[in-house]
Curated annotation (Swiss-Prot):
Keyword Chaperone: no
Main subcellular location of this protein, as a coarse class: plastid
Any one GO biological process: photosynthesis
Cofactor needs: heme
Name recorded for this polypeptide: Cytochrome f
Cellular component GO terms, alphabetical: chloroplast thylakoid membrane
Gene3D superfamilies given in the database record: 2.40.50.100, Cytochrome f large domain, Single helix bin
InterPro entries assigned: Cyt-f_TM, Cyt_f, Cyt_f_lg_dom, Cyt_f_lg_dom_sf, Rudment_hybrid_motif
Assigned protein family: Belongs to the cytochrome f family.
Organism per entry: Spinacia oleracea
Residue ranges crossing the lipid bilayer per the database entry: 286-305
Length: 320
C-alpha cells in the first residue's frame, strides 16, 4: 500500500514539473516573439517623437540603413504595396539572450497618414499575399490604425517586408483630402542594446565602473563573469557583473580606467529610419488630364490633316 502511495506521489511530482516547465516555455516564447512591438507600444503613446526621431532608436543604438518604396500616386479606396527593405549581411550571427549565437531578427514600424490603414484580407490580391508570406501585422494602438508594427521575424526570410495598405476615400472620410502625404518607416535588424527600463542587454559593450586593478575574475556557472576591481582611490572592492554573451577583454592583475571597455561589443545589428511621399489622387483630375491629352492629340491630327488639305489645294492651283 505504501509502495503504491509513493509511486502516485512521484507521478504527481513529475506531472507537476512538466506542467510548470511547459508554462514557463510558453511564457518565455511569447515574450521573445512579441518583444519588439511590445517594447515600443508599452513605453510610448506615439512611436515618432516631435523631433521626427522614431523611438526604436532609444534601444537600438547602432545606425543602419532602411529603405521604403511606395507608388508615386494612389487612387481612393484602393490597395497598394509599401515595401520596406532592411538590408544586412546574412552571414552575420548575433548574441541571443541565452548567450549563444544565432540569426538576426528584423522588425519594422510603418507610420502612415491619418486615414490610411492595413488592408483587410478580402481586399488583398493573391500576388500581394504571396509577397507578404506568413507575416501578421498589427496596429500600434486600437485608435491608431494608421501605425503598423511587425516583428521580430527571421531576417533570413523577411529582410524585405511588404505591407498591404488601403488608401482612404475622401468621399466617406471628410478629414481626408486629395493631397501629397508623408510616410515614415523605422526598421531594425538584430536585438537592442538597452531595455525600456534603461538596463543593458547582453548585446552591448560593458565598461568598467571604477579605476583600479582587476583583482579577480569569476566565471559564473550559468555563463558570464564577476569582475572584482580594487578601486585605486580608496582601495574598496567594486564588482562588475558581465552577462553571458560578450567576450571578455581584460585579465586578472590588469590596470584599468573608469569607463574602459571590459568586453567586446557583440552587436552586429542596428536601427534606421526613412520616409517617402504618396499622392492621394483625385480620379476626376486624372479624367480631366486624359481629356486634355486627348484634345491635344486630336488638335494635332486635325492640324496635320488641314495642312495636307491646304497643300493639295495649293498644288492644284499651281497645276491649273
Amino acid at each position: 500500500m505504501q509502495t503504491i502511495n509513493t509511486f502516485s506521489w512521484i507521478k504527481e511530482q513529475i506531472t507537476r514539473s512538466i506542467s510548470i516547465s511547459l508554462i514557463l516555455y510558453i511564457i518565455t516564447r511569447s515574450s521573445i516573439a512579441n518583444a519588439y512591438p511590445i517594447f515600443a507600444q508599452q513605453g510610448y503613446e506615439n512611436p515618432r517623437e516631435a523631433t521626427g526621431r522614431i523611438v526604436c532608436a532609444n534601444c537600438h543604438l547602432a545606425n543602419k540603413p532602411v529603405d521604403i518604396e511606395v507608388p508615386q500616386a494612389v487612387l481612393p479606396d484602393t490597395v497598394f504595396e509599401a515595401v520596406v527593405r532592411i538590408p544586412y549581411d546574412m552571414q552575420l550571427k548575433q548574441v541571443l539572450a541565452n548567450g549563444k549565437k544565432g540569426g538576426l531578427n528584423v522588425g519594422a514600424v510603418l507610420i502612415l497618414p491619418e486615414g490610411f490603414e492595413l488592408a483587410p484580407p478580402d481586399r488583398i490580391s493573391p500576388e500581394m499575399k504571396e509577397k507578404m508570406g506568413n507575416l501578421s501585422f498589427q496596429s500600434y494602438r486600437p485608435n491608431k490604425q494608421n501605425i503598423l508594427v511587425i516583428g521580430p521575424v527571421p531576417g533570413q526570410k523577411y529582410s524585405e517586408i511588404t505591407f498591404p495598405i488601403l488608401a482612404p476615400d475622401p468621399a466617406t472620410k471628410k478629414d481626408v483630402h486629395f493631397l501629397k502625404y508623408p510616410i515614415y518607416v523605422g526598421g531594425n535588424r538584430g536585438r537592442g542594446q538597452i531595455y525600456p527600463d534603461g538596463s543593458k542587454s547582453n548585446n552591448t559593450v560593458y565598461n568598467s565602473t571604477a579605476t583600479g586593478i582587476v583583482k579577480k575574475i569569476v566565471r559564473k556557472e550559468k555563463g558570464g563573469y564577476e569582475i572584482n576591481i580594487a578601486d585605486a582611490s580608496d582601495g574598496r572592492e567594486v564588482v562588475d557583473i558581465i552577462p553571458r554573451g560578450p567576450e571578455l577583454l581584460v585579465s586578472e592583475g590588469e590596470s584599468i580606467k573608469l569607463d574602459q571597455p571590459l568586453t567586446s561589443n557583440p552587436n552586429v545589428g542596428g536601427f534606421g529610419q526613412g520616409d517617402a511621399e504618396v499622392v492621394l489622387q483625385d480620379p476626376l483630375r486624372i479624367q480631366g488630364l486624359l481629356f486634355f491629352f486627348a484634345s491635344v492629340i486630336l488638335a494635332q491630327i486635325f492640324l496635320v490633316l488641314k495642312k495636307k488639305q491646304f497643300e493639295k489645294v495649293q498644288l492644284s492651283e499651281m497645276n491649273f
